[in-house]
């Protein structure tokens, strides 16, 4: 990726599409930026968290892992408002390696060796993060880094098209991630009713259960929705 104007046109075309804008941005990152996979996660100040889209199953697992654990490059990028670049997850001298113990274990199991997270923001408001991963260690070069920053800006435009965070609810129409949001949102509401807690507390309980069982958040949410799992008072 060495033609910034051409890259900008590709991203603009993705944002202009009538559906799956976020997924198209992820796919373009894989095609053009020399990475194995890409994903976009929603993390807002109102408490919305979820996987918007992912280019493949591994990317989806990495996104879900960070949402479930509340740690990882995506979370740090959103909190700091700055890119988090880890070109070698096996490098013990990288401070991030010690900062995300649970994420590191899951990423290693998934075969991820490098991760790069870019905050998706509009001004001072954070919407989430664009995450890129590689199956082999290696830093992004200057062109790739610049391209990723442009992709994060495009992701912000795509999410704004969906009115992300409006009303404190997950928006409809999040492309391939819509089923994820619908299931997690429904499960959160069911746990909220079962225990008489706030939406934020109910979502935290879902995350805690997924972490304790070593399962994806979506799997636990599906069990709740399909009534295979019910939260009781002792779970509070």
Residue spans of the language-model regions?
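Short hydrophobic beta-strand micro-motif common in sensory/regulatory domains
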Residues: 114-121
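Signal-transducing alpha-helical linker
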Residues: 6, 156-164, 179
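Regulatory sensory and allosteric helical modules in signal-transduction proteins
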Residues: 43, 59-98, 105-113
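Short beta-strand-to-loop transition segments that serve as allosteric relay/switch motifs
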Residues: 128-138, 143, 159
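Intrinsically disordered, low-complexity terminal regulatory regions
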Residues: 1-69, 222-236
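Signal-transducing coiled-coil/dimerization helices and immediately adjacent hinge/linker segments
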Residues: 164-236
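Allosteric cytosolic regulatory segments
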Residues: 145-156
């Amino acid at each position: 990726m060495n033609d910034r104007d051409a890259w900008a046109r590709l991203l603009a075309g993705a944002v202009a599409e009538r559906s799956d804008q976020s997924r198209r941005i992820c796919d373009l990152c894989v095609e053009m930026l020399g990475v194995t996979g890409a994903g976009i996660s929603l993390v807002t100040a109102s408490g919305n968290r979820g996987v918007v889209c992912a280019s493949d199953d591994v990317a989806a697992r990495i996104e879900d892992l960070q949402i479930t654990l509340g740690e990882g490059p995506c979370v740090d990028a959103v909190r700091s408002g700055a890119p988090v670049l880890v070109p070698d997850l096996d490098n013990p001298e990288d401070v991030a390696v010690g900062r995300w113990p649970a994420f590191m274990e899951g990423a290693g199991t998934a075969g991820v060796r490098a991760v790069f997270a870019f905050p998706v923001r509009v001004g001072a408001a954070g919407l989430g993060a664009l995450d890129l991963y590689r199956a082999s260690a290696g830093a992004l070069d200057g062109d790739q880094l610049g391209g990723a920053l442009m992709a994060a800006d495009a992701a912000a435009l795509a999410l704004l098209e969906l009115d992300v965070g409006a009303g404190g609810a997950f928006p409809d129409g999040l492309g391939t991630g819509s089923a994820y949001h619908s299931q997690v949102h429904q499960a959160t509401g069911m746990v909220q009713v079962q225990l008489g807690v706030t939406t934020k507390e109910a979502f935290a309980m879902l995350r805690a259960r997924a972490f304790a069982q070593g399962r994806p958040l979506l799997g636990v949410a599906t069990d709740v929705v399909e009534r295979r799992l019910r939260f009781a008072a002792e779970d509070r």
